[in-house]
């Protein structure tokens, strides 16, 4: 392996300097600006010696975020090392070799003090206490918002203090009333629920007793089954038909059923 650095692949567009667009004088924007008094080589806006170069298109070939390269270009001086650790020691060494040790040391100490005041470990904190501006343009001084609402002004009158106390008292009374009302509603709701549960239990119990009573009344005992019915005691008159023999046999059978003693003998029941 050699000592050559790693190769970085570069990508260029078809027209990296955007000369095709800048040299094209037939486009609408070029003609319109010339009608308004603009000439090629002059700047735009109120200042004539402003930027005269055209827009150049560049391809993003890295994984850096948007604005990273601009931040790198915004270095205040040669000592602005950003977040690179250990570079201040190297700069002190270079300053000692070049004879500017005191100047570089003062500059680095100043940067370290600013970093301690403005941020911590590369994090810069922004005070977000209020959204209003803290600078009074008319009086040309900073506006202090600390404890402005909690402590009363020294020159406040007794009427303002009494009004404030009265307002606090009214708020407190409203709060107490609200709490009492909520407690009362909660208690009423609980009582209503308990009454409903008791009523449901009572109805359930009554229904159960009613079902039990109806079951007892509908139950047929053996004595009731053996007891002859009233309809069996009524024997219809004999009908003179061709089925008189069968009718006679049916009457005899009914007569046997009517006799309780005969039924006991049939079912082998002893008193």
Swiss-Prot record:
Keyword rRNA processing appears in the UniProt entry: yes
Keyword terms, alphabetized: Nucleus, Ribosome biogenesis, rRNA processing
Highest taxon, organism lineage: Eukaryota
MF GO annotations: nucleic acid binding
Organism per entry: Kluyveromyces lactis (strain ATCC 8585 / CBS 2359 / DSM 70799 / NBRC 1267 / NRRL Y-1140 / WM37) (Yeast)
Organism phylogeny: Eukaryota, Fungi, Dikarya, Ascomycota, Saccharomycotina
PANTHER family noted in UniProt: G PATCH DOMAIN CONTAINING PROTEIN (PTHR23149), PROTEIN PXR1 (PTHR23149:SF31)
Biased composition (Basic residues): 165-205
Biased amino acid composition, Polar residues: 17-26
PROSITE patterns on file: G_PATCH
Domain G-patch: 25-71
Biological function: Involved in rRNA-processing at A0, A1 and A2 sites and negatively regulates telomerase.
Residue spans of biased composition, Basic and acidic residues class: 206-230
Residue span of region Disordered: 1-26, 149-233
Protein name: Protein PXR1
